Amino acid sequence: MEQFECINIQQAQQKLADDNALLVDIRDAQSFAAAHASGAFHLSNESLPPFLAQSDLARPVLVMCYHGNSSKGAAQYLLGQGFSAAYSIDGGFEAWRIAFPQQVSAQ
């Protein structure tokens, strides 16, 4: 995959279930701590190096932000770092929270 793809939240759910995808949330730490998709990893400038070092780059990575805009650049960046596939989740956490309130956690 040379270019990331945009997917909706239902497609993201499917990839998490079927493809053993990684889910990362790039929102700020305070927003992530208040609420995030269950199982999401908080990806920040600080957590990026260990994340890249410890992740299986063959697994697809799904990127979530607030509304689905910032995640596009992050998904493309992760592709450039060696991930085999990267996806930006349209609607971001806000769409996820509305559609899947039972799959939202807080720290």
From Swiss-Prot:
<feature type="domain" description="Rhodanese">
    <location>
        <begin position="17"/>
        <end position="105"/>
    </location>
</feature>
<keyword id="KW-0808">Transferase</keyword>
<dbReference type="InterPro" id="IPR036873">
    <property type="entry name" value="Rhodanese-like_dom_sf"/>
</dbReference>
<comment type="function">
    <text>Transferase that catalyzes the transfer of sulfur from thiosulfate to thiophilic acceptors such as cyanide or dithiols. May function in a CysM-independent thiosulfate assimilation pathway by catalyzing the conversion of thiosulfate to sulfite, which can then be used for L-cysteine biosynthesis.</text>
</comment>
<dbReference type="Pfam" id="PF00581">
    <property type="entry name" value="Rhodanese"/>
</dbReference>
<dbReference type="GO" id="GO:0004792">
    <property type="term" value="F:thiosulfate-cyanide sulfurtransferase activity"/>
</dbReference>
<dbReference type="InterPro" id="IPR001763">
    <property type="entry name" value="Rhodanese-like_dom"/>
</dbReference>
<protein>
    <recommendedName>
        <fullName>Thiosulfate sulfurtransferase GlpE</fullName>
        <ecNumber>2.8.1.1</ecNumber>
    </recommendedName>
</protein>
<dbReference type="GO" id="GO:0005737">
    <property type="term" value="C:cytoplasm"/>
</dbReference>
<comment type="similarity">
    <text>Belongs to the GlpE family.</text>
</comment>
<dbReference type="InterPro" id="IPR023695">
    <property type="entry name" value="Thiosulf_sulfurTrfase"/>
</dbReference>
<feature type="active site" description="Cysteine persulfide intermediate">
    <location>
        <position position="65"/>
    </location>
</feature>
<dbReference type="InterPro" id="IPR050229">
    <property type="entry name" value="GlpE_sulfurtransferase"/>
</dbReference>
<keyword id="KW-0963">Cytoplasm</keyword>
<dbReference type="GO" id="GO:0006071">
    <property type="term" value="P:glycerol metabolic process"/>
</dbReference>
